[in-house]
């Protein structure tokens, strides 16, 4: 056994000499740190994700039908990363980002890195360069379906390009996944939905870009519009249902329902009321909502308006919910020295 131990020690030293310190280690040598997160900007989604936000150093896919709120969900994550002092990048392959709307959601558009690439290859090369810099906290690619391979753009309109996009995504994710993990960048890929032809049984819906993204994603979110929110006869927003279809960092298949208000984004007041009343933090008696024996309002919209006007009450309920789900028990982010060291390691 001693010969085997000696041989193993020699092999480990050789590996560390060749590939650098930390390239291989025993799991029990160091305390395994909790996964650091970036808040999603939605309390309900933070709860559904199980760890209080999107995991750092992982790939996340957000997909769903058109106008369901996918980009809104991603922009809220960018806003939260910027609030923590992080750097964010948005790769707009669809050329459809509305800076006015992004600003309304809390995104600092002056500091946001924006790229509108011509081809899929260019978009993914830009993403790789940003990740390898080690200086970007979150990257959003909108969308995978719009990452058109160069050969398809330069070809004729009727030409067949079978599997080109799938091969492009597969190759890109093979190169990106390791760098994303080392740099602790959260990479969010927004995707659309397509329907398979001739499917008689089962779900005919699929996402473009092949299967690679499904495999490499640690979290997959399905966003669907549940109903239209109205104030009188006027539509003021949508209720979106977000399902955690895949989760490698916490139990999957949880759901979050959020109010996405037109021009304003996710309503924090609405989700605090819903979750708070489910946990009996906010008491509901008939149509009346109350907190600590103080009435918030009659009807959901009036209670939301009260919370909007009394931010200290909203914050208090918000913190009580986070404490109930133990969402604040996450290790602190790495120091600047460690981040800069990781940047050097990646180069």
Curated annotation (Swiss-Prot):
InterPro entries: AAA+_ATPase, DNA_recomb/repair_RecA, DNA_recomb/repair_RecA_CS, P-loop_NTPase, RecA-like_C, RecA-like_N, RecA_ATP-bd, RecA_C_sf. ATP binds at residues 64-71. Transmembrane segments: none annotated. PANTHER family: MITOCHONDRIAL DNA REPAIR PROTEIN RECA HOMOLOG-RELATED, RECA. Can catalyze the hydrolysis of ATP in the presence of single-stranded DNA, the ATP-dependent uptake of single-stranded DNA by duplex DNA, and the ATP-dependent hybridization of homologous single-stranded DNAs. It interacts with LexA causing its activation and leading to its autocatalytic cleavage. Belongs to the RecA family. This is Protein RecA. It comes from Oceanobacillus iheyensis (strain DSM 14371 / CIP 107618 / JCM 11309 / KCTC 3954 / HTE831). The gene is recA.
